[in-house]
Amino acid sequence: MRIFPLLRVALPLLALASPAAAQNIGESEIIVTGSRISRPNLGSEDAITVDRPPAIGLKRVADFAVQQVTIVGDTRDEKKRREEIFEMARKAIELAGKRGGIELATGQLVVEPLTLANYRNLEIAEDDDREDVEQVSFLVKTRLAAGMDAKAALERIEAFVEAVPAVGRAEMEKAGDLTLSVVGPDKFRAAIVDLVAADAKAMALRLGPAYAVQANGLDRPVEWTRASLTEVYLYVPYSYSVVPAR
């Protein structure tokens, strides 16, 4: 608990505040979309409902730009079609290992590496509109180096996609828009809490000595949303209460 003049921060032991599953998520690489993300596995009795991200949080450049891709095959023979799809996935993994700045992964929320050891676990999806068409999907990502904008990141990813050798009738193509990922959002908790505490202290000073500002919810897990083409906004879903000073 950090105590300031005219400020009370409700802050239980952070290490004990979150379920283990939520803590594990916060230590992983996380996909960040344009929508506010609430962590799974949080009981409703513990949750603080926030319609939109609070005003105080940490905006920073994401760790990776991420693009979903698909490998689509339409060879009539099912066995051959699937072999072509997986062979192209294998070639993509090998090419990523040779080219600098490109990594392959899977996951909708938590990002996991796609490797030669696990690529055949990719789920095969059938095309609802076309017979004898199947596909697999995964992620192509590139680290957002200092000064790199979204256009440069996308161009690097597109160049990689175009460079992957086709196999039979299998083809690789982009799917959807460029998104972002952040590695270990929980490591930014202390910086976020410091920002909230400083804002609460400043608010309390403006209110005068008769009142204090209490910041609630700082024991909640870090949450995230997209802030710009290359930036993420990390925050704790806190709320303020104005109470009589003691």
Residue positions per predicted region:
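Bacterial N-terminal signal peptides that target proteins for export
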Residues: 1-10
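N-terminal signal peptide c-region/cleavage motif recognized by signal peptidases
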Residues: 17-19
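Short, charged, surface-exposed interaction patches
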Residues: 23-199, 208-246
